[in-house]
Amino acid sequence: MRTTPLAKSSEIERKWYIIDATDVSLGRLSAAVATILRGKNKPQYTPNVDTGDNVIVINASKIKLTGKKASDKFYYHHSEWRGGLKAVSYGELLANNPVKMVEISVKGMLPKNTLGHHEFMKMHVYAGEDHKHEAQKPEKLDINKLI
């Protein structure tokens, strides 16, 4: 009888990838990053094991929002106090904190459990070109070839 080989977290080789977000749609970027973080682009993908790679996203401030999302789409959060609902438009969020906008988008595409949290911790987002992960020798990925 043949059995399917299951991946073990100790046997997985993790790579570092760097993705430039300049003029890339937010949803397409987030979907590609979530796929790499989950490890779905690898042949040894196993749903209950963290098989993904580390991803560095640079130039988050130059991301593209299509349509009227900059003015019509809002990010809501609540302070848990009565009347504490806060709403920030995506255009305002892109101007003030583009890193948070990318993190919210990618986090929504990952599982809502402990494994999803571990996968999310392997993503590093920077608003500009500079990042502090040169020692890991990240491979540059062209986002247009992934989507």
Swiss-Prot record:
CDD domains, sorted: Ribosomal_L13 (cd00392)
Pfam families: Ribosomal_L13
GO MF annotations in UniProt: mRNA binding; structural constituent of ribosome
Taxonomic superkingdom: Bacteria
Protein keywords: Ribonucleoprotein, Ribosomal protein
Keyword Thylakoid annotated: no
One GO term (biological process): translation
InterPro entries registered for this protein in UniProt: Ribosomal_uL13, Ribosomal_uL13_bac-type, Ribosomal_uL13_CS, Ribosomal_uL13_sf
Entry annotated with the keyword Hydrolase: no
One GO cellular component term noted in the UniProt record for this chain: cytosolic large ribosomal subunit
Family of the protein in this entry: Belongs to the universal ribosomal protein uL13 family.
Subunit structure as annotated in this protein's UniProt entry: Part of the 50S ribosomal subunit.
NCBIfam families cross-referenced by the UniProt entry: rplM_bact
Summary of the function given for this chain in its UniProt record: This protein is one of the early assembly proteins of the 50S ribosomal subunit, although it is not seen to bind rRNA by itself. It is important during the early stages of 50S assembly.
The name this protein goes by in its record: Large ribosomal subunit protein uL13
This protein's encoding gene: rplM
